[in-house]
């Protein structure tokens, strides 16, 4: 129905946000990770998935296409509905979840509320082969201090001034190794990555 919605977050609640676009407020259910990284009255690009049930029509929101794709994979698993999929994505990152599935890490998967050993085993059984085929872990910063450095913060602010969305910029800095790069190089790398995902 909607691939994504660009708008201003007017409300942030425990498990959903209200995103205003063209004077319409969309109630969008989100993961804990997403909630903890957004601020009211900022503009965001929210990737969405519309789920229609007998008793309700619900819009789920994600910070990236990768997160939405994993949500859809999880909801395809027998007995895993949107609620449990969101619980999993609120407990671990996309890469952590995929790695847990590939390495048969039942212990990690069962950390998600409502996911027992039987359910975790079913997730691994049904998704392992699908995920193994094309899973490439995101680059991680070798030094967590790097992304908090003056250079990365300056580049972040500059990218926001250029009109890139906060969640996209933050995701780039979080998931990309920018150690040793100059501000100019960070900007070039970020713009190339962000432009290709638009």
UniProtKB/Swiss-Prot annotation:
Pfam families: HHH_5, RuvA_N. GO terms for biological process: DNA recombination; DNA repair. Residues 153-198 are annotated as: Domain III. Residues 1-63 are annotated as: Domain I. Keywords: Cytoplasm, DNA damage, DNA recombination, DNA repair, DNA-binding. Residues 143-153 are annotated as: Flexible linker. GO terms for molecular function: ATP binding; four-way junction DNA binding; four-way junction helicase activity. The keyword DNA damage applies. The keyword DNA damage applies. It is found in: Cytoplasm. Has three domains with a flexible linker between the domains II and III and assumes an 'L' shape. Domain III is highly mobile and contacts RuvB. HAMAP family: DNA_HJ_migration_RuvA (MF_00031). Belongs to the RuvA family. This is Holliday junction branch migration complex subunit RuvA.
């Amino acid at each position: 129905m909607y691939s994504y919605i660009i708008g201003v977050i007017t409300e942030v609640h425990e498990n959903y946000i209200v995103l205003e676009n063209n004077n319409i407020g969309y109630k969008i259910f989100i993961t804990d990770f997403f909630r903890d990284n957004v601020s009211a009255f900022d503009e965001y690009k929210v990737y969405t998935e519309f789920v229609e049930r007998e008793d309700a029509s619900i819009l789920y929101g994600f910070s990236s296409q990768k997160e939405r794709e994993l949500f859809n994979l999880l909801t395809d698993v027998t007995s895993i509905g949107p609620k449990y999929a969101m619980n999993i994505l609120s407990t671990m990152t996309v890469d952590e979840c995929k790695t847990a599935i590939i390495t048969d890490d039942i212990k990690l998967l069962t950390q998600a509320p409502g996911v027992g050993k039987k359910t975790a085993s079913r997730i691994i059984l049904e998704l392992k082969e699908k995920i193994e085929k094309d899973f490439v872990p995101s680059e991680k910063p070798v030094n967590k201090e790097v992304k908090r450095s003056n250079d990365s913060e300056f580049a972040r602010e500059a990218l926001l001034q250029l009109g890139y969305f906060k969640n996209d910029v933050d995701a780039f800095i979080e998931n990309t190794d920018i150690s040793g790069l100059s501000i100019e190089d960070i900007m070039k790398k970020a713009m190339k990555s962000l432009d290709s995902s638009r």
